[in-house]
């Protein structure tokens, strides 16, 4: 079994009435990063994902160079490099009439492995969510899978929970 094919243990569901500084709805790459950064900055985070991992999602399957500094900072870049992937060295634009233009990415970024990667979304999302689960739970927060948020609860304009 590959590293992205097994279930991710997110622990138990927090008790009713639990309090959190931040609630992040959605455990894709952006939600996982938001939950991780908030937890690393001392917030007690609740990360909620409607699916149960592993899951797949249609995507272009690329991680751009500008996001790699965050991927590295969160401890996921090494995980990516240990799985099947391609390093991106250029971008090809194509038109309906078959013409193409290839734009090479900066050589120094490619040499530093910071130009970008191409890998299945399932792999990348899995690694981001798994790492977010580790960071959030180590900081005292909670992660829930298989929960679909139907309503954001507010009290005089302040978010007080979800259901």
Predicted regions and their residues:
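Conserved N-terminal helical subregion
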Residues: 17-19, 92-163
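Glycine-rich FAD pyrophosphate-binding loop
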Residues: 23, 39-59
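N-terminal Rossmann-fold NAD(P) dinucleotide-binding loop
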Residues: 31-32
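Short, well-ordered alpha-helices that flank and scaffold nucleotide-derived cofactor binding pockets
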Residues: 36, 40, 69, 130, ...
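Short glycine-rich hinge loops at helix-strand junctions in the catalytic core
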Residues: 42, 75, 136
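N-terminal FAD cofactor-binding segment of flavoenzymes
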Residues: 57-97
């Amino acid at each position: 079994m590959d590293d992205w094919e097994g279930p991710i243990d997110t622990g138990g569901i927090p008790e009713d009435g639990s309090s959190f500084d931040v609630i992040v709805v959605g455990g894709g790459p952006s939600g996982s990063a938001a939950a991780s950064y908030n937890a690393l900055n001392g917030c007690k985070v609740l990360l909620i994902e409607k699916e149960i991992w592993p899951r797949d999602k249609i995507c272009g399957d690329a991680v751009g160079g500008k996001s790699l500094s965050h991927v590295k900072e969160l401890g996921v870049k090494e995980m990516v490099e240990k799985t099947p992937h391609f390093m991106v060295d250029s971008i090809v634009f194509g038109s309906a009439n078959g013409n193409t233009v290839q734009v090479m990415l900066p050589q120094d970024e490619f040499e530093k492995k910071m130009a970008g990667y191409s890998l299945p979304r399932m792999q990348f999302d899995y690694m981001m969510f798994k790492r977010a689960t580790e960071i959030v739970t180590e900081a005292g927060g909670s992660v829930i899978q298989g929960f679909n948020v139907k309503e954001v609860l507010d009290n005089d304009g302040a978010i007080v929970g979800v259901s």
